[in-house]
Amino acid sequence: MQCLGAEHLDSAERIPTQRQWRPQIYRKCTDTAWLFLFFLFWTGLVFIMGYSVAAGATGRLLFGYDSFGNVCGKKNSPVEGAPLSGQDMTQKKHVFFMNSCNLEVKDVRLSSTVLCVSSCPEEQLDTLEEVQLFANTSGSFLCVYNLNSFNYTQIPNADLLCPRLPVPPSKSFPLFNRCIPQTPECYSLFASVLINDVDSLHRILSGIMSGRDTVLGLCILAFALSLAMMFTFRFITTLLVHIFIALIVLGLLFVCSVLWWLYYDYTNDLSIELDTERENMKCLLGFAIVSTVITAVLLILIYVLRKRIKLTVELLQVTNKAISSSPFLLFQPLWTFAILIFFWVLWVAVLLSLGTAGAAQVVEGGQVEYKPLSGIRYMWWYHLIGLIWTSEFILACQQMAVAGTVVTCYFNRNKSDPPDRPILSSLSILFCYHQGTVVKGSFLITVVRIPRAVLMYVYNTLKEKDGALSRCVSQCCCCCFWCLDKCLRHLNQNAYTTTAINGTDFCTSAKDALKLLSKNSSHFTSVNCFGDFIIFLGKVLVVCFTVFGGLMAFNYHRVLQVWAVPLLLVAFFAYLVAHSFLSVFETVLDALFLCFAVDLETNDGSSEKPYFMDQEFLNFVKRINKLNTRAQRNKNSLTSEEGTELRPL
């Protein structure tokens, strides 16, 4: 690949024995082979997108279809060999089951004939005469399409071409516009087949779509809370930190209490009949246990680290001073989040198209079935890897851009005259020279996350069996991969900052950063960890308030929903939004301390080699060193006292 800018050897690479550690003016492209590999991978993704558009039929999934291959609410093309296909269903938007009270699933296929109708019968129809009257008055024909309403009561085999009597009253369901019977006996049987025996994807979509307004409102709430939290960290004081920690403690305890109360309410509800409601109850128990454990761990950590609050406030104020030199850094997550949303919507659309890609086959009675095309399962895995890798690449680009901005501002001698447009300068360096480095770092995260996903699937599969040893092994492996993921993310962030300084490739940058930080870790490790912990608590606060709103909202929508899945989706989205906004502080903090380590490595504070850090940052570091020295002295004195032998006078 040809670089988009001038290609020169860095001064740091001319002297391999000693790194110069200065922002380079002349750079070269790094990790170009990885960028080419990413380009080839995306060529495959574009092919899958084109294939899904050509072979998929998302309308069948979103709007529903009848037994003859017609999508309800659409104008359809005929299927060869199916005389009742290819009809105009523009006015017939509802899916009606002719035998809704006796549904069965045979070979992953409903036993009842399905039709598209213009409206669902809201009153019970006991005879064919009433079915005929309903068709004439409402224009909704409940018998097969080739039977005229006049013949409903005339031909002898009309009962085989019309719905089984009596036809129960029904209402349209939000997802697929299905006509759902309202009588208790039919409702239980219908729901147990339609929801409990349908595949997981449709059940999850059912819960999300039926509560889509609530999900959207909660996502907006999470967005607003994340903005508020970001500005809270921007103008943080000691009082705000104490209020913030108090809100965290109250929020955690409150959410735990509400979860246990809802679980108790479900266990004493005698009207629960559906498996989906029982799944909601199990999910509530799981949420309650997990939230209780997380609350206990966080409360212990808050108690242990309470003495570091004042230093943490000073640390965040130093971070805010670095951000004030380039205040548009706070808006960096907005465009990153917008790009992620666009990519996720595109990914879901392609996934839905892949899920509906199938060849129409005519079976007995002129009905139509859709058989999945070969190769779809491999495309699905490829598509999933594309989701993880591309999402990590977008987030890594933000990390590199923020780190480059911090580096530019930190290594500026004249603090009163900040550099012009540091964010645009950092972005231009990223896209011209270091995209390959970002691709390589995001690929390492992807390699770790895919086995985690597979192990989680294996663990969930083994939960229903008696393999206790297998479950334990898979869970331990998941924990190991989680720890590896966290370590890699921290290593990647420092590697991106080093690349922004020296212009070196990913492996060289990671090695240099690790070596430099290990030499200077005593200066800032503890306070940096607590700063990251406070930022993490900010994310937890956003999730707590959003989940509480979701619990109150979804608790009133128990009918025909797996509402535990939308609640989990809302919690994940809330954490993701909070992470997108607050990660700017984490990135600035990590980049700032790496620049500080570089400053200590290359300068000594003399007139010949003055520090790049300002006086406020230097005073903060001195206070940390004094506290660390005092703590070490106290520890040594306690050790010596314990080892002293008491002798008689």
UniProtKB/Swiss-Prot annotation:
<dbReference type="InterPro" id="IPR007603">
    <property type="entry name" value="Choline_transptr-like"/>
</dbReference>
<keyword id="KW-0472">Membrane</keyword>
<dbReference type="GO" id="GO:0016020">
    <property type="term" value="C:membrane"/>
</dbReference>
<feature type="glycosylation site" description="N-linked (GlcNAc...) asparagine">
    <location>
        <position position="502"/>
    </location>
</feature>
<feature type="transmembrane region" description="Helical">
    <location>
        <begin position="33"/>
        <end position="53"/>
    </location>
</feature>
<feature type="transmembrane region" description="Helical">
    <location>
        <begin position="284"/>
        <end position="304"/>
    </location>
</feature>
<feature type="transmembrane region" description="Helical">
    <location>
        <begin position="213"/>
        <end position="233"/>
    </location>
</feature>
<feature type="transmembrane region" description="Helical">
    <location>
        <begin position="562"/>
        <end position="582"/>
    </location>
</feature>
<feature type="glycosylation site" description="N-linked (GlcNAc...) asparagine">
    <location>
        <position position="414"/>
    </location>
</feature>
<dbReference type="GO" id="GO:0015101">
    <property type="term" value="F:organic cation transmembrane transporter activity"/>
</dbReference>
<protein>
    <recommendedName>
        <fullName>Choline transporter-like protein 3</fullName>
    </recommendedName>
</protein>
<keyword id="KW-0812">Transmembrane</keyword>
<feature type="transmembrane region" description="Helical">
    <location>
        <begin position="384"/>
        <end position="404"/>
    </location>
</feature>
<comment type="similarity">
    <text>Belongs to the CTL (choline transporter-like) family.</text>
</comment>
<feature type="glycosylation site" description="N-linked (GlcNAc...) asparagine">
    <location>
        <position position="151"/>
    </location>
</feature>
<feature type="transmembrane region" description="Helical">
    <location>
        <begin position="533"/>
        <end position="553"/>
    </location>
</feature>
<feature type="transmembrane region" description="Helical">
    <location>
        <begin position="334"/>
        <end position="354"/>
    </location>
</feature>
<dbReference type="GO" id="GO:0022857">
    <property type="term" value="F:transmembrane transporter activity"/>
</dbReference>
<keyword id="KW-1133">Transmembrane helix</keyword>
<dbReference type="Pfam" id="PF04515">
    <property type="entry name" value="Choline_transpo"/>
</dbReference>
<dbReference type="GO" id="GO:0055085">
    <property type="term" value="P:transmembrane transport"/>
</dbReference>
<feature type="glycosylation site" description="N-linked (GlcNAc...) asparagine">
    <location>
        <position position="136"/>
    </location>
</feature>
<feature type="transmembrane region" description="Helical">
    <location>
        <begin position="235"/>
        <end position="255"/>
    </location>
</feature>
<feature type="glycosylation site" description="N-linked (GlcNAc...) asparagine">
    <location>
        <position position="520"/>
    </location>
</feature>
<keyword id="KW-0325">Glycoprotein</keyword>
